[in-house]
């Protein structure tokens, strides 16, 4: 293919069941990546994870799954882990953002590797957090300074368009806003998609580019 960057799933994203990666599997992956010339590689964590939830059972599962995902990324030598900001199931957005950020910070503190956590922008459907750049900025600001270099943003073009950022009509303006609110240095990855929803619809529906 000639690809120089890739994103994978290290386990089934729709299941809680964890996957152990053996040393042999990890070594084989690292060799294959080097031989293929893939310079940047990372993972997207489970879609079930919600570090902003107020449900104790779901939160416990989410913490375990997120930490296990970080460990697999480290074992495979991946550069980044994309994660969603979660859903404020109790309706308190500020509390959800704070809880998510603190749990990410805890995971980074316990794992002194190089894997960078990238918070993905969302469309803002339902109680989804992170559809405004300011919400993601609030999360990053709660991460201690010593770990700040290991947290960034994954900008999903379909999501930000549905959230009301007019990439179609004012691409440069959106990037300027991103830079003003978050800092362009936080941009670690772009998910390039078109949107089935209209501008500002807050519908999380991807479409093929073009």
Q: Where are each of the predicted segments found?
A:
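Charged helix-capping and loop-helix junction motifs
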Residues: 21-27, 63-66, 97-102, 132-136, ...
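Alpha-helix-loop-beta-strand connector modules within alpha/beta enzyme cores
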Residues: 23-43, 100-112, 139-144, 210
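Active-site acidic/histidine proton-transfer and metal-coordination neighborhood
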Residues: 51-152
